[in-house]
């Protein structure tokens, strides 16, 4: 006896509900109405990011991305995608400001300047930490989930994706199952 599959229709399907999946969904929601996140873990758990410190390495406006990339190329012995790193660093300050707008608080000194910790022995690489320290990953997860909720991004947990559905060379969906019930799912 086979279970009748759950069938979901969406404009954009995001596989993975961690920080990257959440940001992908927020970006997709700027362009389409119906966005769905599926995750193998519990709904809204935040992936491994939820267990992080909630801190960020950010290229502040006074630095040039190419200078930070140069430091990272040295640090990683050249084994990094420099163009990708530069793009991430160029966007990092905007994401930092987005987090602050959503209510994530980064530590500041008495004069209001951001506090940072140098990273990896590099001159320009700075780590900006969540305040109060120690609960930042959980808080980041909460604010991302609140923003997803505000924008009506649908989220389903405990979904194991087993394959992608293709229409020619284009991916048009995914198939999997609900991990607790075993019910097949088609997206």
Residue ranges and their predicted role:
Residues 11-37:
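N-terminal Rossmann-like FAD-binding beta1-loop-alpha1 element of flavoenzymes
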Residues 19, 175, 187:
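Mobile, glycine-rich extracellular loop/lid and propeptide segments
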Residues 3-4, 40-180:
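Conserved N-terminal/central alpha/beta ligand/cofactor-binding core
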Residues 22, 93, 138, 186-187:
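Conserved structured core elements
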Residues 17-18, 133, 183-185:
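Alpha-helix N-cap/helix-initiation motif
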Residues 6-10, 180-187:
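Core beta-strand elements of the Rossmann-like FAD/NAD(P) dinucleotide-binding domain
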Residues 1-9, 19, 154:
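N-terminal charge/polar-biased segments
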């Amino acid at each position: 006896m086979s279970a009748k599959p759950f069938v979901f229709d969406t404009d954009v399907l995001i596989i993975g509900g961690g920080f990257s999946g959440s940001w992908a969904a927020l970006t997709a929601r700027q362009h389409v109405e119906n966005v769905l996140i599926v995750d193998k873990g519990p709904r809204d758990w935040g992936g491994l990011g939820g267990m992080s410190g909630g801190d960020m390495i950010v290229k502040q406006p006074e630095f040039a991305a190419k200078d930070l990339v140069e430091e990272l190329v040295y640090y990683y012995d050249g084994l990094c995608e420099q163009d990708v790193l530069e793009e991430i660093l160029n966007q990092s300050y905007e994401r930092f400001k987005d987090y602050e707008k959503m209510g994530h608080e980064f530590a500041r000194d008495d004069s209001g300047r951001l506090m940072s910790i140098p990273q990896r022995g590099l001159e320009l690489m700075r780590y900006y930490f969540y305040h109060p320290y120690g609960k930042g990953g959980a808080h980041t997860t909460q604010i991302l989930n609140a923003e997803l909720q505000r924008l009506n991004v649908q989220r389903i947990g405990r979904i194991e994706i087993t394959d992608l559905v293709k229409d020619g060379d284009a991916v048009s969906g995914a198939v999997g199952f609900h991990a607790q019930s075993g019910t097949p799912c088609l997206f």
